Amino acid sequence: EFQHIDLNQTHIRLTTDLKNNNLEKYILNLRKELEHYITKNKDFQLSLEPVNHDEEDLSEIIKRMYTASSYCDVGPMACVAGCISEMSLDYLISKKSEYSIIENGGDIAIVNNKKAVCGIYSNNPILGNKIGFELKARKTPLGICTSSGKIGHSISFGYADSVTVLSKKASVADGLATKIANEAVGQNSEYKVSNALEASENYKDLFEGVLIISQDNVGSIGKLPKIVETEEFNVKM
């Protein structure tokens, strides 16, 4: 059963084993810190590439966004949704959660002490939206983030149906999904997948696996969970 948290542009679906978690208050504080910083730092908000800074006394969300941005060669705001998911999950884990799934606009952070199925929203006419990752139980967090040149409101310069990245940190998965999706260009879907895979090679240390879908071509790199055909999901992107 999902709990919904809606705060301005943050729309979260939450499944957790914690009854009284106060997560909404925690996310509200994250958003306040972010909004306060953005008002004074327009480059942080608008840049499409990493931003140099020399400040030391930064709030945790700003630090993590700067770090993920520099790892992934994208602007800090390309990592914001994944970062909020990641920090929300860390907060729940600090409260002793062993099973929590946070989905923030398609960017997921999960810890699951039992099997879970995460739907892949590709908007692909052949696959439909009936495939998902079967995630084995694990005690450490996982980020699963998707970027698309065809759906969603994020900026993408590529044309893949979807690029899904799995990484230990959702902030990094979010930034990498954007970066790799931007490289999904070419004269046909085969070229798009090939170019995106080539771009992924530069970031192998940062992810567990990448899945790229473009029309009738699919490519993957790294280690992905088992992909299953189903309509029964614990969470959808």
From Swiss-Prot:
It comes from the Archaea. Signal peptide: none annotated. Belongs to the UPF0280 family. This is UPF0280 protein ORFE. It comes from Methanobrevibacter smithii. The lineage of its organism: Archaea, Methanobacteriati, Methanobacteriota, Methanomada group, Methanobacteria.
